[in-house]
Amino acid sequence: MRLSSNWSKLQDGVTKKAGKKRIDKKPHIIKKVGQDKKPKSKIMGMIYQMNKEIDQQKENKKVGKKFEFTETITEIDTVETTTETKKDANKIGKYIAMDCEFVGVGPEGKDSALARVSLVNFHGNVVLDIFVKPRETVTDWRTWVSGITPDHMKNAVSFKQAQQQLSDILKDKILVGHAVKHDLEALMLSHPKSKVIDTARHLPFRQKYAKGKSPSLKKLAKEILNMDIQSGQHSSVEDARATMLIYKSAKQDFDKEHRKKFH
C-alpha cells in the first residue's frame, strides 16, 4: 500500500463455481433466513446475523432510535479452506473488505468528499470504522442516503489520519470491494492490482445480473444473498459485510479468474 502521486502533491481512499449438477424435480429456491429460525448452513450464518441487524435498523428508524451495526458477527462462517479459524475470527487476517460513505461539497453539494470508511475481515467482523472530517466545507450531508450528520464529526479523524490508518492495515492484504477503485481514489491511496478483488468487475456477475455492465452492490446482495441493503440510509459496515459475503459466495471463481490474470 502506498500513497498516490496526487496525495504527494498535496503535501507542499459460498457458492463454488457452478458445474454440471443433477437437476432436482423441484427447483431450489434460496429464501431469506428468518429471525425465528437459525440458519441451516454455515454460509448463511453471517447473512442471518446481518438480516437481524437490518430488520432492527428498520424498527429503530420507525421510533427514531439511533442504530449502529455491531462490530462482531455472532454467527461465524468458517466453511472456506483458509488459515483463519473460528478462534481467529476477530483477527485482521488475509482478506479485508472496504466500503466508504460520502457527503456533498462544492456548489449544491454535487462533488463528493470522504466522510466514513469501514473495514471488515473475512468473517465480517469490524476491523476499522471511522468518520473522517472532509477537507472541504460540507454543503450537503446527504444524511438521507449516507446516514452521516454533523454530530458524527465531533469524534472524526482528519483525512491524513484516516489515510495512514488505512495504509497500515491494508499493507500486504487482499482488498475486497465493490467498485473499489473509487474508494481508493477518494482516499488517495493505491493498492497492488494483484491484491484487489472487485465484485463489480467479476465477469460472470456482469453477464448474469447487468447485461455486461457493472451490477450495483444492492443488486448483487439481493440476487446472490437474497438480502435487502441500502433501502434507506447506507451503512459502510453493512455494505462491506455484504461485499465480503458476495466474494465468498463465488470465492473459487474469483480466485481462479485472479490467478489467470496475475500469475
UniProtKB/Swiss-Prot annotation:
One Gene Ontology molecular-function label: nucleic acid binding
Entry keywords, A to Z: Exonuclease, Hydrolase, Nuclease, Nucleus, rRNA processing
Composition-biased stretches (Basic residues): 17-27
Residue span(s) of domain Exonuclease: 95-247
Pfam family, one: RNase_T
EC number(s) per entry: 3.1.-.-
Family annotation (InterPro entries): Exonuclease_RNaseT/DNA_pol3 (IPR013520), REX4_DEDDh_dom (IPR037431), REXO1/3/4-like (IPR047021), RNaseH-like_sf (IPR012337), RNaseH_sf (IPR036397)
Taxonomy, superkingdom: Eukaryota
Signal peptide location: none
Enzyme class: hydrolase
Gene3D superfamilies for this protein: Ribonuclease H-like superfamily/Ribonuclease H
Keyword Plastid: no
Positions of region (Disordered): 1-27
CDD domains: REX4_like
Subcellular location: Nucleus
Bilayer-crossing regions: none
The keyword Nuclease appears for this protein: yes
Stored SUPFAM superfamilies: Ribonuclease H-like (SSF53098)
GO biological process per UniProt: ribosomal large subunit assembly; rRNA processing
Gene Ontology CC entries for this record: nucleus
Function text: Exoribonuclease involved in ribosome biosynthesis. Involved in the processing of ITS1, the internal transcribed spacer localized between the 18S and 5.8S rRNAs.
Family recorded in the similarity comment: Belongs to the REXO4 family.
The protein, known as: RNA exonuclease 4
Organism: Candida glabrata (strain ATCC 2001 / BCRC 20586 / JCM 3761 / NBRC 0622 / NRRL Y-65 / CBS 138) (Yeast)
